Amino acid sequence: MDVAAHLTEMRARAREFGTRYAVAETGLRASRRLTQWLEDTLLEMEGSRGVLGPAHEQWRDNSTAENRRRWNEWDWSTKGEEWNASESWKEALIEDVMLPVIPTGGTVLEIGPGGGRWSVVLAPRAKKLIVVDVAQKPLEVVAERLGDADNLECLLSDGASLTGVDDHSVDSIWSFDVFVHIRPRDQAAYLSEIARVLKPGGVAAIHHSDGRNRGDAPSREGWRAPMSAPLFASLAHERGLEVDKQLREWSAGQHDLGAFHDVITVLRAPLR
């Protein structure tokens, strides 16, 4: 809102409720904008330094309860395919990012399968596919979509752990369009669990945010949780995982992660 429009609205409020009310309301709006700016500034500073500081730890949105409600109520009729930038974008992501880190055979774990748009690619490659989600509805959608697949196991998550998955039992992990909606402290908890369940030499490819004020989209769009490439790498290292690479584009730069400028971090469990 420009200054002239703001003054016009303030005068209207003063006529309707009185000057004191108008001044108080204006102050409240300014205070909220300042609070948001301070929060974004702290998040940016912590993220750039790779520190899980108070701004990240105290992040209020993107809780387990909110995620469970949102994805149980979501319209999964298009199976999550509406989030693909294009069919060629999806095919290139599969060929150039997913398949190189997901070996044929073995046990594959997918965190947050959504409507199963990646599960249908992973299932034929895996000896066993474990899909974990915080909401029951996506698990039902995936089970229906994969039909008679006899290598599928569906697990309901508490939003921060991989309960039901044995230690060092998983060869590879895939998660896309999921961690961007998980609050930072729960992302950290999931990384601890990833370190626990991966076999030595196992690989995980995790798509996550890279800052809240980068890219072409406003910082508050998309119901997204704050994270950064340096912070995610730092959290992974603290849990004994190796960062193999962090991708922002693929197919020789033909495709990327869109307006939010996210990152796919490829992690590896060290050989023991």
Question: At which residue positions do the language-model features occur?
Answer:
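A short SAM/SAH-binding and catalytic strip from SAM-dependent methyltransferases
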Residues: 172-185
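A short acidic, Gly/Pro-enriched loop at the edge of an enzyme's catalytic core
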Residues: 163-173
